[in-house]
Amino acid sequence: LTATQQIIKQAEGMTLEELAQKAIEESNGKTFYGVGNSSRGKAALPLFIEYLQSIDPSYSMEFDWQQPKNNKIFEQLTADSLKPEGTFAMTLIQDGNQIESKMTQTGILDTFIPKEWAEANGTTPDAVDGYLALQTLNKVFEYNCTGSKVYDNCWDFVAEDTHALFMDIDSEVVGKNFLYMLTEDKYAAMLKDAFNALPADEQAYFQPTIDEMESEANDLGLGADGKYALAWIKLWVGSYNAQTDDGPICNTLVSDSATDQCGLLVYSKLRSVEESAGVSVNNIKVAAY
C-alpha cells in the first residue's frame, strides 16, 4: 500500500467523530485547499468548519476553493499529484466516467469508504466495489411557457430557428456524455419513434440530415437507428446557445421575457429562483426527462 492508501485504511476503521478529531489535529489554524467543477464544495466547507467547532470551539481554518473551467480540473490534479507534497486536500468532480479513466486508473485518486456508511449498509469498506456518489442530478428539458409554443417532441429542441440554452460541451463533459449516450440502440430507437410521430412537414426538415448521417452511422458501427441519433446530435451541436453554467440558463428561462425559449439544465436550479414581478418558476414547464 502507498502512504495515502495506508491512511485511507486507518480512516476506514474510524467513526465519524474519530475522523473529526483527526481532522482537527491536522488542519487547525491552517488553510484548506480544494478544487472542483462545482461550487458545492465551497458551500460545504463552512459547514465542515462549523461541525469541527462543535467538537472543539477553539478550532479555526481558512479555505481556498478553485473552480477551473473547460475541464481543466484533471490536468490540475495530475500536476498536483506529481509534487512531493500536493496542494489540494479535497476535490469534487462531477463526471464518474473521467474519474475512472483519468484519476483512479492512473493512481491519482483512491477510494475511501466510511466505516459507519458501510455498517449501515450491512457491508465492510473492503467489500465495496466502486465509488460513493455524492448525489445524482437530473438534467431536464425545460421551456418558457409564457407564449403559445409547446415542446412535446424531442426533435422540437433541434427544430429550425430553435437555439436551446445548454452548458457548453467543452465546459461540462456530462453534456458530451449525454450525446454519446444517444447513439446506444435503445435511445436511437426512441429518437426514430419520436421522428415518426412528427407531422410530415417537420419530418421533411429533418430528413436530409438523417439521410446524410446514414453512412456515418454505418462507418461507426452503430445500430439500425444510429442515423437518427447522429442527426439529432449534429443538429443540437449546430444550434444550441452555449452557456457557462446551468444557473444563468435557469435565470434566463424563468423570466417573463424568455417566451418560448428552451434549455437543458439541472432541475434543482429552480429551487434558487426568487419570485418577483417578472420572474417565476411558473414560467417554466418540464418538457421531458
State what each model feature region is.
Residues 30-50, 63-78, 86-250:
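Extracytoplasmic ligand-binding site segments that recognize negatively charged/polar headgroups
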Residues 80-90, 257-262:
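Periplasmic binding protein-like
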Residues 61-65, 284-286:
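Generic structural signal for residues in well-ordered beta-strands
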Residues 224-230, 237-289:
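Extracytoplasmic/periplasmic substrate-binding proteins
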Residues 58-60, 85-88, 279-282:
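Short helix-terminating capping/connector loops at secondary-structure junctions
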Residues 22, 76-80, 252, 256:
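CheY-like receiver
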Residues 16-28, 38-60, 141, 273-275:
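Short, polar/charged alpha-helical segment
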Residues 1-27, 210:
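N-terminal low-complexity, Pro/Thr/Ser-rich intrinsically disordered segments
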